[in-house]
Structure formats: C-alpha cells, structure tokens
Amino acid sequence: MFLLPLADAQSKTVAALSDDIVFKASPVQEEAEQYLSRYLMQYHFRRVAVNDSLSQEILARFLEQLDETKSYFLASQVEQFNKETGKSIDDQFLAGKADAGFRIYNTFLSQAKKKMRFMIDLLDTARFNFTARDTFDLKRKDALWPSNSAEQQERWMREAKYQLLTLKYSGEEEDDEPRKVLKKRYENRLSLLEKQTADDAFRAYNYALTTSFDPHTSYFSPRDYEDFQIDMSRSLEGIGAKLQSENEYTVVNEIIPGGPAFKSDLLKKGDRIVGVGQNAGGEIIDVVGWRITDVVRLIRGKKGSTVRLKILPVSQANKGPSRIIRIVRDEVTLEEQSAKKEVIDHNGKKIGVITVPAFYLDFEGQKNNRPDYKSTSRDVGKILTELKKEGVDGVILDLRNNGGGALEEAVKLTGLFIPEGPVVQVKNARDGVVVLRDEDADVVYDGPLAVLVNRYSASASEILAAAIQDYGRGVIIGGRTFGKGTVQSILKINRPFNFFYKNNDDLGQVKLTVAKFYRISGESTQHLGVTPDIIFPSFIDSKVVGEDTYTSSLRSDVISPVRNSEPTRLTVDSINALRKRYNERLKTDSLYARYVSDLNTLKSFRDKEVISLYEPDFKADTDRIQGFEAQWNKEDEPDLLLKESAGIVADIADLSKKSLIVGGEAAPWQTRRK
C-alpha cells in the first residue's frame, strides 16, 4: 500500500501541478539510490537473486501499492509498463537508477487526478438510481485492469453509489448530506495529488523496492527519518496511537500500550479514521483525503478532553459501516504501560490475571544501576509473589494486543516460570546462531499457568508463548499470533571516504531486516506465528492482520533444536483432557453461542466479493453488522476469552490434584508438538 508523505514546510508553498509535469530523480536521489541498492544486497537477511523475476516482483508491488483496486490504470498502460520495465528494473537496481519508478508514478498522478475530477463532476451532475439491482465489486485485487475508459468510468460510477450508500447508513452523527461529504473527499484528494513532488515519487518507488525484500524493510529520506523520530512520536500525545497515510485514508499503524486508545480497547491497528470531532457534540469533520499532519492536529488536544473518531473498522475489512468512538485524551507514561493484576473467581477457585501490555525496560535506569528501575520481568515477578501470598489456584498471563518490546525482557519473563535454560534462538544473515538463555535457576511461580494471545500478539510476545509451549510449562489459549519473527536495524547511508565529496547532502537511512527468531524446537515464529493449544474464535480478521498477509514476508523455516533435559508438565494427553473439558462447557454456554453466531455473520460480510447497491438490501446488511458490533463494544460486556481461560486454568489445577497432569523426560517439542 502506498504511504503518502507527511507534510513538510515546502509542500505548503508548492503550486498546483499540471498533469503534464514530469518528475525526474535529482542528483542526490540518484546517489541515494545507488547506495540503497548496495545496502540491500550486502546487509539484508534475505539473499535475493537480482534477475527478471525481481523486476516483475518490484513492478507488481509498485502497481499494487499505487492502484490496489485497479481503479486508475488501464490494461494498455500496464502492458506498456511491463514492456518498458518488466525486465529492466533489476538492471536499474544494480545501477542505482529509479527511472522506471518515476515514469510509472507520473502516469499514476495523471490518472488519479483524472479520476478525482470525473468523480467531482459526477457528484455535481448525476442522478443516482438506488432502486436498480446494481452491484459493486469489493475485491478488485485479482480482477483484470479495465480495457478502456468507458469500462473504467462505469466502475467509477458504481464506486460513487457504494460510497454514497455507506455514508448514508454510517449510523451516527452524519451532519452533511452524503453527496456533499463525498465531493469534499475527492476535492481533498485532488488537492493532495496536485501538491505531489519528485520526493513523493522517489519515496513511493523505494517503498515498493524495499518491501520486495520483506515488509519490514524501508528507506527513509532525511525528512522521512525526522518524521519517523519526531512527528510520529508527537502524534502519541492525545490518544496513544501511531498513524500513517494509505492513499486517501489515515490508518492506525500502532496502538501504544498504556495509552488512552489502548485502555479504551475501541481502536485497533488497521482501522481507518475517516472523521474527527471534538468533545461530546462537536461537528464530525470528514478527513478522507487530508494530509496526515492535519489529521493529527485535529486528534491532539488538551489532556482530559474528549475526541470522537469516526472509523472504518479493520474487523469489517474496512468496508463499513463506519462507527464513532470516544476517547479521552491523556499522556502515555511508563507507569500506564506497566503490568497489572486482578484476581477473579471461577467456581470457587481464585485465578490471578496478569495483563502485560508491552515488554518494557527502563534502559537508562538499568544502565545506571538504579535499584527501582522498571521492567516487565521485575514487575511481573513482584505480582507473582503477591498472588502466591493471596493463595491463587492458577495464573493467566494476558499477552493479547502485546506487540512486543525488549527482547531481553521476553527472556527474563519466561525465566520466572522455568528453571534455567534456552528460551529463543537468533540467526543472522550469515547463518550464525545465538541462543538466548534464562540464566537464573530460580522459578518464581510453578503453578497452573495459561498464556492468552491473539492476532495482535507479536514479536517478544510470540517468543515467550513459544517457549512456554515448548517447555510444556503452560497452556496457550486464544488465536494464532501475528507471526513477526524478524529483527530490524536502522543504518545511516554513508558515502565511503566522505571527505572526497563536495556534496555532503544527507542520503537518508535504511531499515533492514537482519535476523530471524527461532523457537528452542528449531521452528521459526516468523510468518506462522504461534498456534495456541486451545483456539478461541476471534473478531480479528486474520486475512488482513498478520505477517502472512504480506506477500513478501520471509517464510518460516527450521534450524537445529536446542536440547534441554527439563521435563514437560503438559503432555499431549494433558492438552487433550483440557480441550475435552473446555468443549463440554461450551455446549451449555449461551453467551458463547451468541458470540459464534455474530462471528459467522461478520465473516459472511467480510467474505463478500460483491455487494448489492439496491438500497433496501444494503441497509439490511448494514443494520445487522451495526447491531452486533454495538453489542460487543459495550463497556460492560464480559471478556468471554478471559472467562473461558479462567475455566481452563481451574481445570489444570483440578487435574494436577488428581495426578492427571504429569511430567515426562523427553524434550518438550517431541511430546507436545506432534
């Protein structure tokens, strides 16, 4: 997906560009491209064969990020791109050239502006018929490119009808008439397109080039890197979320643990923000087509004030209907990110719940040997000691929505539950493998344990969950994890022998994938993630969230296991016994039955490839989705997964007392992972 740039001071003074403007790479950009190609070839974990296949991959990725829904380019234009550049991008890559990218981007700009003007005129003049049995194709990714302008414009007209119906039945606080709102969106988008520069073309092409190696590799121009360090961190003030632009939309890229958005549990990674309103009754301003800096300016505000966000939820594959959420602005502090505990009752058994939003570490405090410095492992260790004193029958470690953090803390936290031993393996691009171990033989807690995960549990969370699973130390419950099992490093692009150069312009930075994580079993968490022992259905759409949704993600592979002689507590038979009890409970759980029914309704909506533009049918679908989403987003709605997990931990405690959960001398992965 194409990431539109953060605005800079210069963009405000750029005059509207005519469609015949042709962008070309500057000398500094050409030089940066030369070094970028060398860095990718020399340092990236993936060894890429530079040939015509790479040319095709980069071209396909570039066309997809510019025009994923096949809305701008015609088939004849794509054919010309393939003829001109389909077998030469690899040669340009080795030569450090970006000519192909600039040519394609120039055509994209012309076509995109053409569409925006068409849509604006259409909304001014057309009379739309919503009683006809028309349909709109939602999944255009695998469709053919339009063969001519007439076919293209027919699709544009259907798109306008779909957008108008979506706005009409968005459900809440739509002050303006849908046609007016939609026209303004296209005007905003056109304005943004007319302010594009050669820097934007260079950025877009290099995004396609670098993400062809893997989705976490990227190039930062000097301005981009400043935005990466400063502007995006400033955007945390207010709601605690990182945002990025994808075409005309502002998209949530990350939810910061402990922040207002995290605590509200209403905003998710991948949600599109289409409107922003202030306080309880302020106007919802449509922000589709806005520059991201302007959107951030609306979202930020005084601590304690309320911001209302109109979103297209990722849970509905961003198709709509939209939903309005309310978040109270606040600061994000380390204290808010800290692990927290509660004790819940399950049929007379006390179950301790430890919520870990992130793997945090006060590096400065650790470096200076402060006795009270904060870290995940230290905080959780204290909580476990408290829970033991309170006499809990079992513990749940909740890692849902935990995107990772300090690797050191994942290793130390695992060590609270196991004797000393290997936790994770790290392999670099030269096939060197380092084993990270828990060096502390003490076990803080050795009782019944469950680890909760979901699709947003990533990186360090997956390392801990995998280790607990491979040791047979606890049961993993929830949904398959994200699958982020790689390590990135940011390198500054430097000229060799820089003192020979008169031009000392900054060439930017490159973020490279340089290593992969592997379980002690030898399997990689990359791409596949961690599959729970007991799977719980989820509202999260695994088709749009997760490492395996990226076509260029590094695949999972296997290296040698790390042998260890520690016995496993939970064998295959133990897990099967827990599953049996769990499934028996679900048969009589009416809340779970309603949950599954609503999930099936949502899944059928997500999987729709074609949607009706016949207004009564469209409204009926929208009402049904809004109804169950409103139910499950109530603040007082029970945490169903936590409730079921408490039952499973209680089962572990019960089976342990009956000596039905026993250890074994074989390596855990030989016992558990058959």
Name each model feature, range by range.
Residues 65, 87, 101, 106-117, ...:
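PDZ/PDZ-like domain segments forming the peptide/carboxylate-binding groove
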Residues 460, 472, 477-545:
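Polar, glycine-rich mid-to-C-terminal structural blocks
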Residues 9-11, 15, 180, 196:
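Boundary at the C-terminal end of the N-terminal hydrophobic targeting segment
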Residues 25-68, 75:
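N-terminal-proximal low-complexity accessory segments that begin disordered
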Residues 24-25, 38-51, 191-198, 217-236, ...:
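Cleft-lining beta-strand/loop regions that shape enzyme active-site pockets
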Residues 122, 172-184, 516-673:
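Conserved functional hotspot residues or short segments at active or partner-binding sites
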Residues 50-56, 63-138, 190-245, 306-308, ...:
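Extended, small/polar residue-biased N-terminal targeting/export presequences
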Residues 13-21, 33-45, 84-88, 184-188, ...:
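Acidic/histidine-rich, surface-exposed loop or edge segments in extracytoplasmic proteins
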